[in-house]
């Protein structure tokens, strides 16, 4: 049975209707947010995810489920169940480390993803940046932010080097080291786009780590390393604005202080770079 989007089922209703033998096991964990939880029956665990963004259309949540349905088990957890507002996915047993894997391992994982068939929907950053501007706290809108936004919109997004399915939220907490190797979780922002955009968006510690990843990927993908790095740098202003806007967006939604601190730090980085 599919619930009404205007009156979504509660977690307890989902459990009683679709998972009567399961009980909540862990309230929150790495890669989980917005009311998601782990449910368990004996030793079997499932991740129950909730559509937690009130400003995102239900179609975006459905895309998340469809992305997981398309991906092989060598990359992502299996999609198990969907009803409007909720999905259930396989729980991956393994180790989550806040630090990224080494460059060669991560490059291999991303290259494997980028070799898969495309999802069927493109990632478009310009309208997303505009949405973050319009949905943020009006008191946080600054002339600097507006100038940067208009400049990016005027320039347009870089021409893709190679189009592929992207994860678009690659950081240590979204990578699980399982007994079968590395897997990516939390595919909320997945879509088709430039491989260099994916690499530009990885949450690296510094430029040295970024260059190591780019060089390792270029070697595996047989791309000229200098050409790939130039393309990554073209995407860099877009990615920094994307992160700043997302922090502002989440601050407006949640009021959590961590987001305003991260937003302030990202704006400082942007101002320092002109």
UniProtKB/Swiss-Prot annotation:
Catalyzes the ATP-dependent phosphorylation of thiamine to thiamine phosphate. Is involved in thiamine salvage. It catalyses: thiamine + ATP = thiamine phosphate + ADP + H(+). It comes from Salmonella heidelberg (strain SL476). GO terms for molecular function: ATP binding; thiamine kinase activity. It holds the Pfam family APH. It is an enzyme of class 2 (transferase). InterPro entries: Aminoglycoside_PTrfase, Kinase-like_dom_sf, Thiamine_kinase. Coiled coil: none annotated. Belongs to the thiamine kinase family. This is Thiamine kinase. GO terms for biological process: thiamine diphosphate biosynthetic process; thiamine metabolic process. The gene is thiK. Pathway: Cofactor biosynthesis; thiamine diphosphate biosynthesis; thiamine phosphate from thiamine: step 1/1. Keywords: ATP-binding, Kinase, Nucleotide-binding, Transferase. Its EC number is 2.7.1.89. Signal peptide: none annotated.
């Amino acid at each position: 049975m599919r619930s009404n989007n205007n009156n979504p089922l509660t977690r307890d209703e989902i459990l009683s209707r679709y998972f009567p033998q399961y009980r909540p096991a862990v309230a929150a964990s790495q890669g989980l947010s917005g009311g998601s939880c782990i449910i368990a029956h004996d030793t079997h665990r499932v991740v129950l995810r909730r559509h937690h963004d009130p400003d995102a259309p239900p179609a975006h949540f459905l895309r998340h489920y469809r992305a997981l349905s398309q991906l092989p088990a060598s990359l992502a957890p299996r999609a198990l169940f969907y009803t409007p507002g909720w999905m259930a996915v396989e729980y991956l047993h393994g180790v989550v480390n806040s630090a990224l894997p080494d460059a060669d391992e991560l490059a291999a994982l991303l290259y494997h993803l980028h070799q898969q068939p495309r999802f069927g929907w493109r990632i478009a950053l310009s309208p997303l940046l505009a949405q973050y501007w319009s949905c943020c706290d009006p008191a946080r809108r600054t002339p600097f932010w507006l100038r940067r936004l208009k400049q990016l919109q005027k320039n347009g997004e870089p021409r893709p080097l190679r189009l592929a399915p992207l994860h678009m939220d690659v950081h240590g907490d979204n990578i699980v080291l399982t007994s079968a190797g590395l897997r990516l979780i939390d595919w909320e922002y997945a879509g088709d786009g430039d491989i260099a955009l994916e690499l530009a968006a990885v949450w690296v510690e510094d430029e040295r780590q970024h260059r190591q990843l780019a060089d390792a990927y270029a070697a595996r993908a047989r791309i000229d390393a200098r050409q790939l790095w130039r393309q990554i740098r073209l995407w860099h202003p877009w990615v920094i604005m994307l992160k700043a806007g997302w922090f502002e967006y989440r601050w407006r939604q949640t009021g959590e202080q961590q987001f305003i601190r991260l937003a302030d730090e990202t704006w400082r980085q942007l101002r320092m770079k002109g």
